[in-house]
From Swiss-Prot:
Peroxidase activity is inhibited by aminotriazole and azide. Residues 63-628 are annotated as: Peroxidase-like. Residues 1-626, 1051-1065, 1138-1171, 1224-1230 are extracellular. Residues 1078-1218 form the Ferric oxidoreductase domain. One of its GO terms (molecular function) is NADH oxidase H202-forming activity. Its EC number is 1.11.1.-, 1.6.3.1. This is Dual oxidase. The gene is Duox. Keywords: Calcium, FAD, Flavoprotein, Glycoprotein, Hydrogen peroxide, Membrane, Metal-binding, NADP, Oxidoreductase, Peroxidase, Phosphoprotein, Repeat, Transmembrane, Transmembrane helix.
Length: 1537
């Protein structure tokens, strides 16, 4: 009867090669005679070779064709329970688990150290032979048996390392008596689904099959086996002579533990390729592995000779079945009786309900009894009883010298010599004592190369949660011991001290004794009652539960006759038939040595007579990585520094380009001078501690210039009005000191230069003399002592200090000292300082500088002439003091007299119209505008005469002038002379509070509020104004922190048992948490830059709930947050990689399942950083991140925008590398894609929308070069392009750098059928654009095109939604309003259904002067014409003056007021707009608007310009809103420049 196959096996059966037909074949009459063959062995091989063709050939064919192939991994042995006995199945428990916590913590928490127990009960003398003359071959064959059925001591993942305490001054491990040593112990692999609760305590797994199925020979993996097979004649691979297996050149994952005596990982290719990964551990177990490989090949060769037509697979399978059967027979019926001294009950057949699993007590305690028989060395001999010595002359090979180095052992030794030596060698005594080679010198990891097997055995029982010794006995049906002597009465009778030590060690707790200790102590001569019961029970279950057991006739593998013959096979038959050992050279019962057996051992081996074992303590896995780790840290630290240096160089490069451009532009504008310019390098001496390198330029005009290294002028030394130049040179008595030269001219501070040498000074003097002669000037040269010259030199700094003191004294004498202010001179030096001040006088240039004007301005000349009463060309201290007193305390008539005298050029006592016209022109010149023509000046003067009834006169007397200025009498009260020289104003500060404004604001009598309520109002107002920003910022950081905390908690507490957590500590929690947060932040950045989406959302009501205008600020906040977490992630991983680099190969095996390391390869820091996907991309990401963030610095963005933008395009690489970064799964599955997917799709779609116009080449309709280097470009508007006024585009020109795009605001209105931009030439690109379209250079045939990307939403585009709006533009920030104001007047004046809600709009233009914005004045002029509904009110603030009530400003105001009355337009701009001088008081203005438009609930305030401007407007809105009155001001802003 055939046994039904399992589903997997049926699939295999279909592919089985059918047995070749044998119907007509007759048996050859052969007699097989092999050396040493016995009746059983000969008959066995006869049966195998001929296929049992003793009867019917057909019978055999039928049987073999239906024979089921046994799987290698142990599955489907039991068809009802396919996983029983399979690889990675649980160890089984017969006794209840006894974990300390009931779940997984090691048992015996209160028991003594296992090393101490080992020293107490397992230490003894070597060299005591077996009581029953068991051979060493039996002792090592026991290891084969163990390897065949169990592998449950190997550490699993995660690594769990425990420390076995070592007593101080331990003779082996703590010879220095340090007391801090420990033996590392790794817990065994277990099922990850167990150990979670008391209902499912931890269960260790068996990584071998539990069956005796030849897995020691054939492995548990078919892939592994295929590497061993030759696929020729059914044999396994061997070397050419067929005696040894091949080396592991294919790098099958054999165990390649470090050799203790070498302290390094050797190549796995030196090992023999065999079925069990542990076979290279020692020479004895390796010999058995080679023996059975030969046994398989011997059978295969015999089968092939008899059946030459059989396939390789048929031969292999038949040989495998026979090898497994012979192994089963040897283990159960030969080894076990010899080991236990008793046999198993007779076989009763297959019992499918019996579980074959390896028991915990069997694996962790009972079957480890065989360790006591292991000798300290291995004898080798030949067939003539010649025992072979080692090369050093020792009688045997020391076991502890061959751990994991057995492959080289067979270079001068044969398997036969080892097997015959083991058969003659008597094992160690069967007692609790272990020989020193396994008790003190067992192999270990490189950091602890020698371990204690006895201690490890006890720890393994605790690891498996074994109960105490008595409970374990009871679970196997044995009686509990009630007294200590019950354990082993004969032993304790002969060794009573052992009993005392046992009681003391376990605190006299008999029910707390470890299973292994109790079992070993009860054994003597052979396993004790308990261990015998455990071992017999285990092997009986293995035999009876095995469906493929060779005695099971129902499996169809062997016939009863074959089974009977197989039962006769012994290990002696296998050795004699597989090796060159002859039958008389080895005893028949190889497990026992009896008198008369061949070749008795010379003596019982003792460790003292063998080669000493080396003991190398400690190993640093980080060795070799120290320098590289330092280099990596330094490199990563220098990356941002290098990026910053590159950014600095880029800024300097762009500044240099701008300077060269500026110089070229100035050269084109300036008149051409004839003559050459001579130069010389020198150092300008400023004071004792400061010098600067300068280039002195002579000419070409009559002036000497000092220029810095950037080419910028530092000082001009004018010689126009000077005839004689005084030159002093330092005396030549200081040879070692560098020479100095001093240039002194009247009305200017001195120029002191340090030259490199006296020769250089002579050269300088010669050049200066020639230059002065060329311009017809004289030079006086005198030699002065160097120190005296430097002490007397009046440098700029000294002159400045003197002038400050000059102005301060004038202020103090006029107004007195302020409260708390002290005079800054001492009494001792007061007289000298007073004299110094009295002697100081101001030149016209210094006076002009104090007024903030140029010396050639007419106003300066006139004012200087008024103050300089003695007309000596300088203003003395007394003259200046009188003027200050007059302006600060003088009467209005006195001030008017000064103005009258300024206008009276010819000093005839009257002002004619010509003189008044000249003054008007000087005032207009101050305002830096050219909008006032001759006719307008004449018209203005006639109007002023007419206003006071003097139209019949052509001149004004002083009385007439007073009459004309009568209405401005109040303004003249506060007239002062504002000077920059002093650090205080020369006006009473109370007068400065007033503002000249057209806004009539009545003072509001607010009730005084308690300061606490005022603070509360301010706080509430702040929250109300920024509620959306605060909410989304709060939401953003809550999500970011939650993501960090979630991952941190997961890796800190939920995954604390994993290897990542064990190795990296809290570092992995920090890095994984920061990875989650930075993934979120970087992904969110894409949404903030989805400009088309943001622009579109502004058209929907949702924009009321999302602060879309703040997307740039939020982009920066999210980026800075991402930067923080990126740096944290990087630093964390640097620490993590350090920890990883300090780990052993075994620990790294569990670190990740994604990376496999060769057993002889130790990855260092360079591997993790530069040879893994995660490390390499991480370094690249760090570099890209540094580049992007450094080049995003505001300074670089402003000075080198092109570099900023080009570096910012690296974000594509940032996101690609971030996606790749986690694919290696070193620390976990990649998660970046989860955050990136949504924003990435949105951003990609947004970019696709931008492509709609980006690659559309638009025709240039018209270009216009405007003053102040502005160009207006009008170009084609694409069809279906919709935009709002105030929006902006990114623009490029196909004529040059077509891929370089720059952002510009659209100045065309949405209703116009074209697009336009006003671009001021500032940088290289804008200058190229202007020069390209310059009519002098432009070729109309070139027909360049414009490409745009956008339009995108600006902060000002929602202006039309407010009934009342205030618009504030400053500097270049007026550009959006060119479009907005046009759109406003179009919407309110021509189309009542335009959707513009504005009923009143205030536009405030703040600029230093109108000079650079003539084009915008034209725009405003056009807007004023179109504004028929007067919805727009324009105010212009000119900020170039210091003070509202400065003398100049007052006169300008008077003229402006007259001109406004006369022509209804401004004298400066020609606009109806009101002009103001100075900066606006935004708070007062907003209060005025609030009061005037109290009927609305909210007013929109829109500001655009430099950051200080928008911040001041924001502050004003905050201040007004704090009053908690309606209307409420909502501020929208956009920063330019």
């Amino acid at each position: 009867m055939s046994v039904p196959s399992a589903p997997h096996q049926r699939a295999e059966s279909k592919n089985r090669v059918p047995r070749p037909g044998q119907k007509n074949r007759k048996l050859p009459k052969l007699r097989l005679h092999w050396p040493g063959a016995t009746y059983g062995g000969a008959l066995l091989l006869l049966l195998i070779s001929y296929g049992l063709e003793l009867g019917s050939v057909h019978c055999y064919e039928k049987m073999y064709s239906q024979t089921e192939k046994q799987r290698y991994d142990g599955w489907y042995n039991n068809l009802a329970h396919p996983d029983w006995g399979s690889v990675d199945s649980h160890l089984v428990r017969k006794a209840p688990p006894s974990y300390s916590d009931g779940v997984y913590a090691m048992a015996g928490a209160n028991r003594p150290s296992t090393r101490r127990l080992s020293r107490l009960f397992m230490r003894g003398k070597d060299g005591l032979g077996s009581k029953f003359n068991r051979t060493a071959l039996l002792a090592f064959f026991g290891q084969l048996v163990a390897n065949e059925i169990v592998m449950a001591s190997e550490s699993g993942c995660p690594i769990e390392m425990h420390r076995i305490e070592i007593e101080k001054c331990d003779e082996m491990y703590d010879r220095e008596c340090r007391g801090d040593k420990y033996i590392p112990f790794h817990r065994a692999a277990y099922d990850r689904d167990t150990g979670q609760s008391p209902n499912a305590p931890r269960e260790q797994i068996n990584q071998m099959t539990a069956w005796i199925d030849g897995s020691f020979i054939y492995s548990t993996s078919e892939a592994w086996l295929n590497a061993m097979r030759s696929f020729h004649n059914g044999t396994l691979l061997t070397e050419k002579d067929g005696k040894l297996p091949v080396r592991n050149t294919m790098r099958v994952p054999l165990f390649n533990n470090p050799v203790p005596s070498v302290m390094k990982m050797l190549s796995p290719e030196r090992l023999f390729l065999l079925g069990d990964p542990r076979t290279n551990q020692n020479p004895a177990i390796l010999s058995f592995a080679i023996l059975f490989l030969r046994w398989h090949n011997t059978l295969a060769q015999r089968i092939k000779r008899v059946h030459p037509d059989w396939s390789d697979e048929d031969i292999y399978q038949r040989a495998r079945h026979t090898v497994i059967a012979s192994l089963q027979n040897v283990i159960v019926y030969e080894y076990l009786p010899a080991f236990l001294g008793t046999s198993l009950p007779p076989y009763e057949g297959y019992k499918q309900d019996i579980h074959p699993g390896i028991g915990h007590i069997f694996q962790a305690a009972a079957f480890r009894f065989g360790h006591t028989m292991i000798p300290p060395g291995i004898y080798r001999r030949d067939g003539q009883c010649n025992f072979k010595e080692t090369p050093m002359g020792y009688p045997a090979v020391r076991l502890c010298s061959t751990w994991w180095d057995s492959s080289g052992f067979f270079a001068d030794t044969s398997v036969e010599e080892v097997l015959m030596g083991l058969a003659s060698q008597i094992s160690e005594r069967e007692d609790p004592v272990l020989c020193s080679d396994v008790r003190d010198k067992l192999f270990g990891p490189m950091e602890f190369t020698r371990r204690d097997l006895g201690a490890l055995n006890i720890m393994r029982g605790r690891d498996n949660g074994l109960p105490d010794y008595n409970t374990a006995r009871e679970s196997y049906g044995l009686k509990r011991h009630k007294t200590w002597t019950d354990i082993n009465p004969p032993l304790f009778e002969t060794q009573p001290e052992l009993l005392d030590m046992l009681k003391e060690a376990y605190d006299n707790k008999l029910d707390d004794v470890d299973v292994y200790v109790g079992g070993m102590l009860e054994s003597y001569g052979q396993p004790g009652e308990f261990f015998t019961a455990v071992i017999k029970e285990q092997f009986q279950r293995l035999r009876d539960a095995d469906r493929f057991w060779f005695e099971n006739e129902r499996n169809g593998i062997f016939t009863p006759e074959e089974i009977a013959e197989l039962r006769k096979i012994t290990l002696w038959d296998i050795i004699v038939n597989s090796t060159d050992v002859k039958e008389e050279e080895i005893q028949k019962d190889v497990f026992m040595w009896r008198t008369g057996d061949p070749c008795p051992q010379p003596m019982q081996l003792n460790a003292t007579e063998l080669e000493p074992c080396t003991y190398l303590e400690g190993y640093d896995y980080f060795s070799g990585s120290e320098l590289m780790f330092i280099y990596v840290c330094v490199f990563l630290g220098f990356v941002p520094i290098l990026c910053a240096g590159a950014g600095y160089c880029v800024v300097k490069l762009q500044n240099s380009k701008r300077r060269r451009l500026k110089i070229r532009q100035e050269a084109l504008r300036a008149p051409q001078h004839k003559g050459s310019v001579d130069k010389m390098l020198a150092r300008e001496w400023l004071h004792a501690n400061h010098k600067r390198l300068v280039t002195v330029k002579f000419g070409p005009e009559a002036a000497i210039y000092t220029v810095d290294r950037k080419g910028e002028k530092l000082r001009t030394f004018s010689l126009k009005h000077i005839d004689v130049v005084s030159v002093e040179e330092s005396a030549t008595n200081h040879i070692k000191k560098k020479p100095y030269i001093l240039l002194r001219v009247p009305s200017d501070h001195d120029l002191v230069l340090e030259l490199e040498s006296y020769g250089a000074r002579r050269k300088f003097v010669k050049k200066l003399e020639d230059f002065l002669l060329l311009h017809k000037k004289e030079m006086t040269l005198m030699e002065v002592n160097r120190d005296i010259m430097l002490a007397r030199a009046e440098t700029r700094e000294r002159r400045q200090k003197r002038l400050e003191y000059f102005f301060r004294e004038a202020y103090a004498l006029t107004f007195g000292l302020r409260p708390g202010e002290r005079r800054r001179r001492s009494d001792a030096s007061s007289d000298g300082e007073v004299m110094t001040v009295m002697r100081t006088s101001l030149s016209k240039a210094e006076f002009a500088a104090a007024l903030g004007m140029k010396p050639n301005d007419m106003f300066v000349r006139k004012m200087f002439n008024i103050v300089d009463k003695d007309q000596d060309g300088r203003i003395s201290f007394q003259e200046f003091l009188e003027t200050v007193v007059l302006f600060s305390r003088g009467k209005t008539d006195d001030k008017l007299r000064i103005i009258f005298d300024m206008c009276d050029n010819d000093r005839n006592g009257v002002i004619d119209k010509g003189e008044l016209s000249e003054m008007m022109r000087s005032l207009v010149e101050i305002a830096r505008t050219t909008s006032l023509g001759d006719d307008q000046v004449t018209e203005l003067i006639d109007g002023m005469f007419q206003d006071v009834g003097l139209e019949h006169k052509n001149h004004l007397t002083y009385q007439d002038f007073k009459l004309m200025m009568k209405e401005y009498k109040g303004d003249f009260v506060a007239i002062g002379l504002d000077c920059k020289g002093a650090k205080q104003n020369f006006l009473d500060t109370s007068t400065n509070v007033a503002r000249m404004t057209s806004f009539n604001i009545e003072p509001m009598q607010d009730k005084p509020r308690h300061w606490l309520l005022a603070k509360w109002d301010a706080y509430i107002t702040f929250l109300e104004e920024n509620r959306q920003n605060i909410f989304y910022l709060f939401l953003f950081y809550v999500v970011t922190i939650v993501l960090f905390v979630e991952r941190f908690i997961h890796y800190s507490f939920m995954a604390e048992h994993t290897d990542l957590r064990h190795i990296m500590g809290v570092g992995i929690a920090i890095t994984r948490g920061s990875a989650a947060s930075l993934s979120f932040c970087y992904s969110l950045l894409l949404l903030t830059m989805s400009r088309n989406l943001i622009t579109k959302l502004k058209e929907f009501p949702i924009q009321q709930y999302i602060p879309l205008d703040s997307h740039i600020q939020f982009h920066k906040i999210a980026a800075c947050t991402a930067l923080f977490f990126s740096v944290l992630h990087t630093v964390g991983h640097i620490v993590n990689f350090y920890h990883v680099s300090t780990q052993s190969h075994e620990n790294l095996r569990c670190l990740t399942r994604e990376v496999h390391f060769a057993s002889d390869y130790k990855p260092d820091i360079t591997f993790w950083l530069f040879q893994t996907v995660t490390g390499t991309t991480g370094v690249m990401l760090f570099i890209i991140m540094c580049i992007i963030f450094v080049f995003a610095h505001p300074t670089i963005r402003k000075k080198a925008y092109n570099f900023f933008w080009n570096m910012h395009t690296l974000y594509i690489g940032l996101y690609l590398l971030s996606l790749i970064h986690g694919l290696a799964r070193l620390t976990g599955p990649p998660r970046f894609w989860m955050f990136f997917l949504g924003p990435g799709i949105v951003y990609t779609l947004d970019k696709i929308v931008s492509l709609r116009t980006k690659y559309m080449a638009l025709d240039v309709i018209d270009t216009d070069l405007l003053p102040s280097d502005v160009i207006k470009i009008k170009f084609y508007r694409p069809p279906n392009l919709k935009y709002l006024s105030g929006q902006w585009v990114r623009l490029s020109c196909t004529a040059f750098r077509p891929h370089e795009m720059h952002s510009f605001t659209l100045t065309s209105a949405p209703h116009e059928n074209f697009l336009s931009c006003h671009i001021k030439a500032q940088g290289p690109w804008t200058w190229k654009l202007r020069n390209y379209f310059d009519p002098c250079n432009y070729n109309p045939e070139d027909q360049p095109k414009i490409r745009i990307e956008g339009p995108f939403g600006g902060g000002n585009q929602d202006w039309y939604k407010f009934e009342v709006a205030v618009m504030v533009g400053g500097g270049i920030g007026v550009t959006p309003y060119a479009s907005i104001l046009n759109d406003l007047v179009f919407g309110t004046s021509t189309n009542r259904y335009s959707g513009v809600a504005c009923k009143k709009v205030y536009f405030l233009w703040i600029c230093p002067s109108h000079k650079h914005f003539e084009w915008f004045i034209d725009v405003l002029r056009d807007v004023e014409k179109k504004d028929v509904t007067n919805v727009l009110e324009i105010h212009i603030f000119i900020t170039q003056f210091f003070h509202k009530f400065d003398l100049r400003t007052t006169m300008l105001y008077i003229c402006e007021n007259h001109f406004q009355r006369l022509s209804k337009t401004s004298i400066f701009t020609g606009l109806k707009a009101v002009n103001h001088f100075g900066r606006p008081d935004m708070s007062s203005f907003l209060k005025f608007v609030q009061k005037k438009h109290s009927y609305v609930s909210k007013i929109g305030v829109f500001s655009c310009g430099p950051r200080p401007l928008t911040k001041s407007v924001m502050s004003a809105c905050d201040e007004v809103n704090k009053t908690r009155k309606l209307p409420y001001f909502i501020h929208h802003f956009e920063n330019f420049g």
